[in-house]
Design a protein with these regions (language model features):
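Conserved beta-strand elements of the Class I
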Residues: 161-163, 307
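Nucleotide 5′-phosphate-binding alpha/beta core
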Residues: 1-122, 129-144, 148-161, 168, ...
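AMP-binding/adenylate-forming
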Residues: 141, 163-223
Length: 448
């Protein structure tokens, strides 16, 4: 949740102080996410009028490309080199602009715009490549307005109570007291630690949920499914009925969705976003996933691999960015009336995990996030679990940026996710081996 959560001060503070620190950080996030830009975008979404969607999208695209030309050296040079003349006259002309690869985003300092963009997003992604991007406050608030508008359409409004299942280290790994959650008061958000999930601890989570009685659940669907399985197997009753469930980050299987709907007696509405700032895709009441065209353009690429152009990435502009996820786009329309392109399937978001000797799960998102402490000096990582108490992190270093102490720093970050019972080894390799399908599996459990 916040960089300082791993600090010794936080880890050794009494629980009420940890809640206070979480809320303090929550206040910082609240001020970043909610403000004049958020209010403006949400009002615009609420009063949407019927317009020519292609013409509106071309206007948005040209505004964004003009910004890139004025404020971003990388794109200014790119447009000049490839004779890109603005404004574009048709949306199809976007294809004249070369594809932006992850390696360029990671290594080229010219990709950062010459404007104030104080909010940093970092990702390990589904490919294990570590990246840092920057957002303006306006970008951040516009994205938040779209996410809140999506939830609003399903009955959940800002200020209602949330239960969020997170793989961030909000509780010390070796905590003995069975309170694996912390409260973010400014956002009325109870944060539940996925890191501490275990068949022994799930009853504690259920008791907390029944006491807190949230209006909605969000975050890791894997964790919510574990709770649902426990409730079904033990015939335990909930004392609340959420308005909706909003899973994030992972691909939700049909059986997982059915189980959540059955046990929590609430509809499940999926969403797609990314730490890099990809255009938003959300699910409507008819079960279809729609692109929010105000946030960008998604182009189908080879083998379903998409290219994204995101209008909410002024700090680190993404134009025809190969994000590494796969989607199937559809020409169908939807009874809900949403003008955004229908996305019939999304692939590439499956989350794997390492299982600890104590029976906990450490998810791939947490493992890849460890490289974010380094200055883009690691190109890629892969975690191999050889035994229940032994993992090996393979990493590919950037020869120009990597320094000797970076391995020590990285190992320390990985160690924070486990108890001393886990033996951890780091190994520098020239490349990570791809699977037969051409993709890299970030986590491989070899002992099962």
């Amino acid at each position: 949740v916040m960089p300082s959560l791993h600090d010794k001060i936080y880890a050794h503070s009494p629980l009420p102080v940890q809640n206070w620190l979480i809320s303090l950080y929550g206040l910082k996030l609240y001020r970043e996410r909610y403000g004049p830009y958020y209010d403006k975008e949400l009002k615009k979404l609420r009063r949407q009028r019927l317009v020519d969607p292609d013409a509106a999208q071309l206007n948005r695209l040209n505004r964004f490309l003009h910004f890139c030309q004025r404020h971003n050296r990388y794109y200014r040079n790119l447009f000049k080199r490839h004779n890109i003349e603005l404004p574009l006259k048709h949306l199809e002309e976007l294809q004249q602009i070369p594809v932006l690869e992850k390696e360029t985003l990671r290594t080229n300092p010219d990709i950062f715009s010459d404007i104030k963009a104080p909010i940093i997003g970092s990702t390990g992604g589904t490919t294990g490549t570590a990246l840092q991007v920057r957002f303006t406050v306006e970008d951040y608030q516009a994205r938040m307005a779209h996410l809140d508008y999506f939830k609003e359409q399903h009955g959940f409004t800002k200020g209602m109570k949330r239960a969020s299942f997170t793989d961030r280290m909000i509780c010390p790994r070796d905590q003995e007291e069975p309170i694996y959650w912390r409260y973010n008061a400014p956002m009325k958000q109870m944060l539940y630690s996925v890191v501490h999930f275990h068949e022994r601890t799930i009853p504690d989570y259920v008791d907390s949920l029944n006491t807190y009685r949230p209006d909605a659940l969000d975050g890791s669907p894997s964790a919510m499914i574990e709770v649902a399985k426990y409730l079904k197997e033990t015939d335990t009753r909930l004392t609340f009925k959420p308005i909706a469930i909003f899973p994030t980050s992972e691909t939700l299987s049909p059986w997982g969705r059915a189980l959540l709907t059955e046990i929590f007696q609430a509809p499940v509405y999926d969403q797609y976003a990314s730490s890099e700032g990809a255009p938003l895709v959300t699910e409507c009441k008819h079960g279809r996933m729609h692109l929010h065209p105000e946030t960008g353009i998604i182009e189908p690429g080879e083998n379903g691999e998409i290219l994204v152009t995101s209008f909410t990435t002024h700090g680190t502009p993404l134009v025809r960015y190969r994000i590494g996820d796969r989607m199937t786009l559809s020409d169908e329309t939807c009874p809900c009336g949403h003008s955004g392109t229908v996305i019939s399937s999304i692939d590439g978001r499956q989350m794997n995990y390492v299982e600890t000797p104590e029976g906990y799960k450490v998810f791939e998102g947490d493992l890849t996030a460890t490289v974010a402490v380094l200055p883009n000096s690691v190109l890629q990582v892969q975690v191999l679990q050889h035994e229940v108490d032994q993992i090996e992190m393979l990493y590919v270093k950037d020869e120009e940026r990597f320094e000797d102490e970076h391995e020590t720093i990285l190992k320390r970050e990985v160690e924070r996710l486990f108890t001393p019972n886990m033996r951890i080894r780091l190994k520098n390799v020239p490349a990570i081996k791809k699977e037969p399908n051409g993709k890299i599996r970030v986590v491989k459990r070899l002992h099962v």
